[in-house]
Amino acid sequence: MADQLTEEQIAEFKEAFSLFDKDGDGTITTKELGTVMRSLGQNPTEAELQDMINEVDADGNGTIDFPEFLTMMARKMKDTDSEEEIREAFRVFDKDGNGFISAAELRHVMTNLGEKLTDEEVDEMIREADIDGDGQVNYEEFVTMMTTK
């Protein structure tokens, strides 16, 4: 499974992993797992985290080593592009339910995820995803953004 990752992705995951491997012993605790995954743009629910941990933490010692982490991230990334998850993510961003993600809505969600972005950064994210140039992101644009790597 992990062999489907690019070298760049593996390097990115290694960097994130080591940020949370505080004592440098090559393992992270399960409670740190959610934080690590969110830093990589994933947004697992508590139930998903528990499932992933149960699948990966074979000896039940509450820690995950890097190879286990890679396998899990590869599995998670493969699942992430499912249409329903993308639709659900869009609904999370589209606070007022009007079918568009505005700069304000994007800023709100990113702030809740702990990402303190400047107005310029938020505007840049909107511009990158905003194919028709109307200043906001519709569902089709969101799908394109989420599925192009």
From Swiss-Prot:
InterPro entries associated with the record: CALM/Myosin/TropC-like, EF-hand-dom_pair, EF_Hand_1_Ca_BS, EF_hand_dom
Binding site for Ca(2+) 1: D21, D23, D25, T27, E32
GO terms for biological process, alphabetical: apoptotic cell clearance; cell migration; embryo development ending in birth or egg hatching; establishment of meiotic spindle orientation; microtubule cytoskeleton organization; negative regulation of gene expression; positive chemotaxis; regulation of apoptotic process
Binding site for Ca(2+) 3: D94, D96, N98, E105
GO molecular function: calcium ion binding; enzyme regulator activity
EF-hand domain segment(s): 8-43, 44-79, 81-116, 117-149
Protein name: Calmodulin
Protein task: Calmodulin mediates the control of a large number of enzymes, ion channels and other proteins by Ca(2+). Among the enzymes to be stimulated by the calmodulin-Ca(2+) complex are a number of protein kinases and phosphatases.
Assigned GO CC terms: calcineurin complex; cell periphery; centrosome; cytoplasm; mitotic spindle; nuclear membrane
N-acetylalanine modified-residue sites: A2
SMART domains xrefs: EFh (SM00054)
Miscellaneous notes: This protein has four functional calcium-binding sites.
Record keyword Protein biosynthesis present: no
Top-level taxonomic group: Eukaryota
Quaternary structure annotation from Swiss-Prot or TrEMBL: Interacts (in the presence of Ca(2+)) with pde-1, madf-3, rpl-7A, tax-6, efk-1, npp-1, obr-4, sos-1, akt-1, unc-13, tag-196, ugt-48, nmy-2, F27D4.4, ddx-23, efa-6 and R11H6.4.
CDD domains with a match to the protein in the record: EFh
Residues the entry annotates as binding Ca(2+) 4: D130, D132, D134, Q136, E141
